[in-house]
Amino acid sequence: MSREKYYITTAIAYPNGKPHIGHAYELIATDAMARFQRLNGMDVYFLTGTDEHGIKMLQSARKEGITPRELADRNTSAFRRMAEVLNSSNDDYIRTSEERHYKASQAIWQAMVANGDIYKGGYAGWYSVRDEAYYGEEETEVRADGVRYGPQGTPVEWVEEESYFFRLSAYQDKLLDLYENNPGFIMPAERRNEIVSFVKSGLKDLSISRTTFDWGIPVPGDEKHVMYVWVDALTNYITALGYPDTTDERWAYWPANAHIIGKDISRFHAVYWPAFLMSAQLPLPKRVFAHGFLFNRGEKMSKSVGNVIDPFELVERYGLDQLRYFLMREVPFGQDGSYSHEAIVNRTNADLANDLGNLAQRSLSMIAKNCEGKVPQPGAFSEADKAILDQADAALETARKAMDDQALHLALGAIFAVVAEANRYFAGQEPWALRKTDPARMGTVLYVTAEVLRRVGIMVQPFIPQSAEKLLDILAVPADKRQFADVLASPLAGGTDLPAPQPVFPRYVEADEQN
């Protein structure tokens, strides 16, 4: 039986500097969504990569006295290494400087030409190098420093040059119909409202080529023009699936189930991209989800501003799964969030070390001592036993619904509510006291606790994969019994030998800090 396909992408990162925590946040969250759907039985394809063309790359390279290709090669290797360090399960890594991407970008350009949507004209307007975006005069403002800024707070400059244009104005009504008929196309709702309002205010045709630099994909048939970076960048999502060869087996993954992006690029993904696809007569992605910004104690991070936090250092300092857990649990996905040393330590020590780690250590140590290191044979389940087992089952359904809406924090919240309840159950049943008074009941309580840990261990795999693997290993859960379908279908069998219990989550102790 062929499994349902699920295609998910991050935005491709811009490698004019080193990776920062914002890149890591998007990759970790998207990785968790990809892992979740794999465990849910889907045939998943997960793409990330780097967006290597454009004037910013050229300017950054010139400052360093190297070519843009050298800059792209050097910095892309740091982004690839970040994906490895973060334990990202991406199926492909795309670079827009690859030959396959030149082919795909030129093919979508020609498809838009064939549809009558590209024409040559002259462009004069305000352009932000940092945003790689054009803005109308009404979207800009001159501040006290005498500099004109765009809506993202970045400086804009006046640009005049010959340009090809895309007839974006012809797609205004089609886009508004799309948003109305598919309210889930752009999420969360705040982003959707912004996009609808932007499109309703009137769309102007879009300049889609430049002649003032040559670091980009040449326009087919007019090589002195290179494609405006967003035509090139957005096309990466179909390049990776073999476009323009729609007989490629990977093409079956299109349309994408979700493009996960930062909210600052929602206009490109929710307005320009569907319009380009409509013009090229290609199916539209099912969802564009724009997450919020991460603030370091309240200040927005940006490579261009220079206040970025190195994700490699954070992993080194706190541990990978601790960082993954914190970012997905602490910040409602789609909203802006803030982080600090104290917040990371408090959240990971409380939830991971105390609640989950400690429960596993206490219950499995008791099984090792009192049950010959084997899963105990349970007796009849009491109401309390059934209640905690039922809550664990219900959490999976809650998590599935939450993940359908990219609400990672709600999925984790439901799973960790089970962990908190399991701690209350364990404390209330007092298996250490039952050892003398009712050893059979003690065995049942320890069985139920271990079984809840097994269910939780399976459910947390997308979020904290290495730690979940350790937990499932010490519960002797076979490698082929770790899918979501196994939460109900494959309970622990009494009499199974368990390995010696190992701590799963070390506590973060300030004394460990060597500054």
UniProtKB/Swiss-Prot annotation:
InterPro entries: aa-tRNA-synth_I_CS, Anticodon_Met, Met-tRNA_synth, Met-tRNA_synth_2, Methionyl/Leucyl_tRNA_Synth, MetRS_core, Rossmann-like_a/b/a_fold, tRNAsynth_Ia_anticodon-bd. ATP binds at residue 303. Its EC number is 6.1.1.10. It catalyses: tRNA(Met) + L-methionine + ATP = L-methionyl-tRNA(Met) + AMP + diphosphate. A motif ('KMSKS' region) lies at residues 300-304. One of its GO terms (molecular function) is methionine-tRNA ligase activity. GO terms for cellular component: cytoplasm. A motif ('HIGH' region) lies at residues 13-23. It comes from the Bacteria. NCBIfam families: metG, PRK12267.1. Monomer. Belongs to the class-I aminoacyl-tRNA synthetase family. MetG type 2B subfamily. This is Methionine--tRNA ligase. It comes from Brucella suis biovar 1 (strain 1330). The lineage of its organism: Bacteria, Pseudomonadati, Pseudomonadota, Alphaproteobacteria, Hyphomicrobiales.
